[in-house]
């Protein structure tokens, strides 16, 4: 197997429905501009509150992809 190098970036996805959908939104957005995504790791979840009510779910996600730079 050839040696490979992967780059890791950190993103925050949001959803008004769930943490899972927030994480999926982050990965989906990353896939629009990055190739060869490999692993996504949810590292933190939080809520946005307004007047004591949940208005958004946020998932912080580390996404790795194969590094092809020079």
Regions found by a protein language model. Name each.
Residues 40-48:
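Short, conserved loop-to-beta-strand elements that form functional interface hotspots
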Residues 51-70:
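C-terminal structural segments of small proteins and small subunits
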Residues 6, 37-40, 54-60:
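Short connector loops at helix/strand junctions that flank enzyme active sites
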Residues 13-15, 44, 65-67:
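Flexible glycine-/small-residue-rich
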């Amino acid at each position: 197997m050839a040696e490979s190098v992967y780059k890791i970036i950190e993103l925050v996805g949001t959803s008004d429905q769930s943490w899972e959908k927030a994480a999926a939104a982050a990965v989906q957005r990353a896939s629009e501009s990055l190739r060869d995504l490999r692993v996504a790791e949810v590292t933190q979840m939080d809520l946005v509150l307004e007047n004591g009510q949940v208005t958004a779910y946020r998932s912080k996600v580390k996404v790795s992809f194969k590094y092809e730079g020079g």
